[in-house]
């Protein structure tokens, strides 16, 4: 394998070609940073968390491909991934994940000890998540915890404690992950059933669209609660309303249960997260 081919394989391993995962991890982190800092996060803090988000998502992808290497080759959508196709060994994937996680940990050294302690828990959850598809009925809940760990970490970094609004934001994010990753799991449901894997799309069965709607409901109610706790102005509702429109559109898509519609609904969550961030920015900056 040439150097160019090896670089390309590593790029695919950490999903450089698919930034949606990084964005779904980044939006909740930005929500928390803006709320914790009352709308004025320091540039250093912002850069640390943005870079850390990219590194940890990349590490998570590498460990996910290692964990799923014996399953991915049997799924049409994933059979060409670098590890399962043999372009990268399982050992290499683990090393890549470890190196990226180490860089992320070194990156947060300027932050307080509380944030560093939380980062260890975040790493453990991120590395455990891929294996939960073997035994948990709704592994998407663990994904929500992993993708939401930037929330308590951001509050800890800025305030050195975690207030109630952070936990409300965190719980809402878990349900958001259940919503968008259930749509994602609907794409591979037939393959996952054949392989004996467990996902929320399988667990919810014919009620999966209702479960997605309920999860979105929890997200949007939690956002309103956070807005109240953080004393955001009514301008927050501009972003909140736009995000709600996104959710309604996504529910319409997944209701068809077509693979391409479910995948589009999943990807469309980037806009939902961005609109909620816009609402927080407006609610903090315009009183």
From Swiss-Prot:
Q: What is its EC number?
A: 2.5.1.39
What membrane topology does this protein have? Multi-pass membrane protein
One Gene Ontology BP term is: ubiquinone biosynthetic process
- GO MF assignments: 4-hydroxybenzoate polyprenyltransferase activity
Coiled coil stretches, renumbered: none
* EC category: transferase
Q: Which HAMAP family match?
A: UbiA
Kindly give the PANTHER family that the UniProt entry links to this protein: 4-HYDROXYBENZOATE POLYPRENYLTRANSFERASE, MITOCHONDRIAL, PRENYLTRANSFERASES
The entry's protein name is 4-hydroxybenzoate octaprenyltransferase
Originating species:
Polynucleobacter asymbioticus (strain DSM 18221 / CIP 109841 / QLW-P1DMWA-1) (Polynucleobacter necessarius subsp. asymbioticus)
Provide the gene name from the record: ubiA
